[in-house]
UniProtKB/Swiss-Prot annotation:
Sites where the protein binds Cu cation: C88, H92
Topology versus the membrane: Multi-pass membrane protein
Organism: Oryza sativa subsp. indica (Rice)
Disulphide connectivity of cysteines: none
Pfam family of the protein (one): GAF
4-aspartylphosphate sites (modified residues): D696
Protein name, per record: Ethylene receptor 4
Classification via CDD domains: HATPase_ETR2_ERS2-EIN4-like (cd16938)
Length: 777
């Protein structure tokens, strides 16, 4: 190429010189011919510049691609080619400059050198092409191989993505089955088989489960086969028709492994799974855990249950037998099987929760029925208790009223022992009435009153009652009092008297006088903190025993003869008293009602007995506050109401008679009425004959009573000439005590009631209330 260029350049120069010679030789030059030659020269110069620019740009491009790729194998050939290109470009560039300076010697020398170097470089490039072209061909072959491999990888990647999508779809279907209500284990297994068949293009799929009642057999419960006539799959529930032994080696191998196992096509499990289908290709199997929720007994210990598994058998089509099961396919099977296990576990848990909910609902119904029966029994018991208390309260109220008249006779003719007996009877009756009021009105809350009372009088009356009970039971009685006991103390005398009577009654019930002599002892003395305690269960108190406090020890004991103790120790002998108790029943003192009372009174109580069973005792220690100053017990004032005309309405004959006697004792002229209606009829017929009306009506005690005291009072105020009548009504003990909101006072004002007297009606209480009413009105 350089030689051709040189020849062209020399020819152009010769032509240019001859033309000039012709023009300068004499004669006129052809201006048109000179213009064409000049145009050609300009065209050659431009072409040389463009060719030079093109040649010089090629090495730059090669350098750029060399930085982007590894050209170590063709480095020599590339260098030769780059040198050849650069020299060719330089030759064309110098040739372009010769058109302007054709006779420049340096330019001609440079052009000659460039052409010589270009010739050498072209020769070297031609030689290097002998090795460059085969390498280039090998690179092309490798590129085609890589392209084919990339195509196969792309195709495999598409298959993997499709299978992953199918796996995701299978997981979503199983999740939907889990969220379905209610989930079914067989439905979950069917969904698993269908989704795996769709994802992997299976020829057949089978689900084996342990046979019910046959632990050594597996039953084919589901079988999925591909029908050749259409694209749909046929899912059959086989049932118990096809079985396989649980001790088969393939079955044992699958059961023992957590991952999928590839089986031989001629194995027993594979042959049994391809029932009714064409011969299959590669076979894989995996176990699916079936959760059995532990059943808990009453103690909370779980029952140990043996693990149970189902087997999922997957069969590929025969034309895929060469490929077999890939690791990715087995991973897909593992993922779907794990999801199926989760779904089965969820279904088992939900099934167990439903059964537990049903059992809990049944138990709740039973508990509600039991609660209803218990509430009915409680209401019945309360009704019976209230009826019994109401039935007992009226006789007790009558006794209290009669005893109040005996305590305040018109002439003081009673002997001291008679007065002591009457006071003891009055205290016992008041205690019984108060206890019944507590049972009816305030059964839960216990309160202790702290007010001054005569300790000597209480002890004398308690000893009197204890001696009377001992003599009635045929036992002896002995009491011992300390002279240093204070006269007046502050406390709840009713609670103390109740505790003492209970101690006496408990020991007397344990005394069998027919088997031998018994003697009851009663002792009261002051004790101190350092006194020896008789019960290990009792924790000593640490009160401050100053001059304002005193600690009193009450001890009631029972002593028996040797023959009585021996007879009581025989196991075959039963006590003859129906109320007798055993030694274990002595503990009732420390429980419930009495224990609360003792604690509220800052005291302690315990029982003790000797090893031979001859003697038993109950000890009570109470702390009292001493009453400061001298207290004078003045007898209550009994007024005399001269000829006060009173109408008494009471629906109980005994109470009516006692209240009438009390009113007559107060100097009243009394007419009685057995009911509220009779009272109203008497008032309507003789309006001006009565000055005061006493109402003691209780419709709860008498079911036939039509009206209570408040209703009768309202009817009385509705009468024409009854505005001047004074009305006093007798109410139960707890009505006024529990009236915190003033509802009873408001009801009395609305009904026109002038006074209230608390039951039981006694001579001092009724006299004081009548005096107050007469003074206020």
């Amino acid at each position: 190429m350089a030689m051709v260029t040189a020849r062209q350049f020399l020819a152009s120069a010769a032509e240019l010189g001859s033309g000039r010679r012709r023009c300068g030789g004499g004669g006129a030059c052809d201006m048109r011919e000179d213009g064409g030659v000049e145009a050609l020269m300009q065209c050659q110069r431009v072409s040389n510049l463009l060719i030079a620019a093109s040649f010089l740009s090629i090495p730059l491009e090669l350098f750029y691609f060399a930085t982007c790729a590894d050209l170590s194998e063709v480095k020599c050939a590339v260098l030769h080619f780059c040198a050849f290109i650069v020299l060719c470009g330089a030759t064309h560039l110098l040739a372009a400059f010769t058109h302007a300076h054709p006779h420049s010697a340096p330019l001609l020398r440079a052009l000659t050198a460039a052409k010589v170097l270009a010739a050498v470089a072209s020769s070297a490039a031609a030689v290097s092409l002998l090795t460059f072209i085969p390498k280039l061909l090998r690179i092309k072959v490798r590129e085609s191989l890589l392209r084919d491999k990339a195509s196969r990888l792309h195709r495999d990647l598409g298959l993997v993505r499709r299978r992953e999508e199918a796996t995701s779809r299978a997981v979503r279907e199983l999740t939907g089955r889990i969220r379905a209500s209610p989930p079914d284990a067989h439905a979950i297994l069917r969904t698993t088989a269908l989704q795996l068949a769709d994802a992997l293009g299976l020829h057949a799929c089978a689900v084996w489960m342990p046979a019910a009642g046959r632990p050594h057999d597996l039953v084919l419960v589901h079988h999925l086969t591909s029908r050749p006539d259409d694209a749909a799959d046929l899912l059959l529930e086989v049932g118990d028709a096809c079985t396989v032994a649980a001790d088969d080696p393939d079955v044992v191998d699958v059961m023992a492994s957590k991952v999928a196992k590839v089986l031989e096509p001629d194995s027993a499990l594979a042959m049994a799974s391809s029932v009714g289908a064409a011969p299959a290709g590669a076979v894989a199997a995996i176990r699916i855990p079936i959760l059995r929720v532990s059943i808990y007994d009453g103690g909370g210990t779980p029952e140990v249950t043996e693990a149970s598994y189902a087997i999922l058998v997957l069969l590929l089509p025969p034309h895929d037998a060469a490929g077999g099961w890939s690791s990715h396919d087995l991973e897909i099977v593992q993922v779907v099987a794990d999801q199926a296990a989760v779904a089965l576990s969820h279904a088992a848990v939900l099934e167990e929760s439903r059964s537990m909910r049903d059992r809990f609902a049944e138990q709740h119904r039973a508990l509600m029925q039991a609660k209803h029966r218990a509430a009915m029994a409680t209401r019945a018991f309360s009704s019976i208790q209230s009826a019994m208390c109401h039935a007992m309260r009226r006789p007790v109220h009558s006794i209290v009223g009669l005893v109040s008249m005996l305590q305040h006779p018109e002439a003081d003719t009673m002997r001291p022992e008679q007065r002591l007996a009457v006071d003891a009877i009055a205290r016992t009756s008041n205690l019984l009435s108060a206890l019944m009021d507590e049972v009816i009105v305030n059964r839960q809350h216990l309160s202790v009153q702290r007010k001054p009372f005569s300790l000597h009088a209480l002890i004398k009356e308690a000893i009197s009652v204890a001696g009377c009970l001992s003599h009635c039971g045929g036992a002896g009685f002995l009491h011992q009092l300390e002279c240093a006991l204070p006269e007046w103390v502050v406390g709840d005398e009713r609670r103390v008297f109740h505790l003492l009577l209970d101690m006496v009654g408990t020991l007397l019930n344990r005394c069998n006088t027919e088997s031998g002599a018994c003697r009851l002892s009663f002792s009261i003395r002051i004790c101190n903190v350092g006194e020896e305690r008789y019960s290990l269960d009792w924790i000593p108190m640490r009160p401050t025993f100053s001059g304002c406090n005193v600690c009193v020890k009450f001890k009631v004991g029972i002593g028996r003869s040797r023959s009585c103790a021996i007879e009581r120790s025989l196991p075959c002998e039963l006590p003859r008293r129906s109320a007798a108790t055993t030694s274990s029943q002595m503990g009732h003192i420390f429980s419930g009602y009495f224990n609360k009372i003792v604690q509220m009174m800052n005291g302690n109580m315990w029982s003790a007995s000797d090893s031979e069973g001859v003697g038993e005792s109950v000890t009570l220690i109470l702390q009292f506050k001493l009453q400061q100053g001298h207290v004078e017990a003045s007898p209550p004032y009994i007024p005399h109401l001269n000829g006060l005309r009173v109408l008494l309405a009471d629906d109980d004959a005994m109470n009516r008679g006692v209240t009438k006697k009390i009113l007559e004792r107060l100097g009243c002229q009394v007419m009685s009425a057995p009911s509220g209606a009779h009272c109203l009829s008497l008032l309507a017929s003789a309006e001006a004959s009565f000055q005061l009306v006493v109402l003691d009506l209780d419709d709860r005690a008498v079911p036939s009573a039509a009206m209570d005291g408040f209703e009768v009072a309202l009817r009385i105020r509705e009468l024409r000439y009854s505005c001047w009548l004074l009305i006093v009504i007798a109410v139960a003990a707890g009505v006024v005590a529990t009236d915190d909101g003033g509802a009873v006072q408001e009801l009395c004002q609305r009904a026109g009631i002038n006074g209230l007297v608390q039951k039981p009606v006694t001579l001092p209480a009724l006299g004081a209330q009548l005096c107050r009413v007469l003074q206020d009105n």
